[in-house]
Amino acid sequence: VLKDNGYHTIHCGKAHFGANDTPGADPLKMGFDVNIAGHAAGSPASYYGMQNFGNKPGGKSPLAAVPGLEKYHGKDVFLSEALTIEAEKALDNARTTDKPFFLYMAHYAIHTPIQPDMRFYQKYLDKGLPPIEAAYATLIEGMDKSLGDLMDYLDKNNLTDNTVLLFMSDNGGLAAHTRAGELHTQNYPLNSGKGSAYEGGVREPMIVSWPGVVAAETKCDHYLMIEDFFPTILEIAGVEHYNTVQKRDGINFLPLLTGKGKMPARDIYWHYP
C-alpha cells in the first residue's frame, strides 16, 4: 500500500512472511522495492560472515542460510552489522529517488542460534555471565548498536526531524533449555517467555521517536497488538484510501502518539496453535 502511494519501500533482514516456495517467501512480491537478506526462514543458519551465514558454496545450503550477502562471505563480520551497513546503503539510494522512504528493519537477532557477537562478548563474560547468557546479551547489544547507527545516519543526513521511528519486538524473550537459569525467570520480572501466554511471552518493548509530535520521555501503558501498526503507519503516511484482500483487524493508535483522543476499548486474547 505504501509503495502504491509513492513510497520507496525497503526490507532489510528477517522476513519470514510466508513458507518456502510461496509468494510470501519473497519480500519483493510483498510490496517492497528492495529486499536485503529476507526470505522464508525465521532464523539464520549462522550469524557469522566467516561461515557464509550458513551458505555452502558448491553444495546444498540449508533453508535457513541467509541469502544475498555474498560480499560478506568469508569475512569477519556479524550478521547484525552487515545488515546495518546494507540498510544505510539502501537509504542512500532511497534519497536519490525524491520519494519518501519506508524502511522495515527486521534483525535476525535475537533468535537462535545463540551465537556470540564477538565485538561485545568478553565484557559480559567478565561480568560473570555464563557463556550462553553472555552470547544472548551480545545479540541484544548488537541490535542496539544497529539502531544507534541508523539514528546517527538520520542525524548526519538531516532526516531525523522528518522521520518517524517505531521500535518493537514480535514476541517476548527466549525462555528455553538453550538459555541458562530456570525457565520462569529468564525474562524476570515477567513470567515465562516466547510461545507463552504469560507476560514474558506477549509483553514486548516499544519505543517511538517522532520529533515535534511525540513528547520525549513520555510513557503510555495502553496495550497494542502488531496488527495495529498497519493502519497507524498508513495514517502517519497520509494514505487515506486503500483496499486490502484481507480483513483488517488493527486499530489506528495515532491518538496515543499525539495525545489527542483515545483508543477504543477491546478484548484481547492469544491463540498459540
Q: Which residue ranges define each predicted feature?
A:
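Formylglycine-dependent sulfatase
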Residues: 1-273
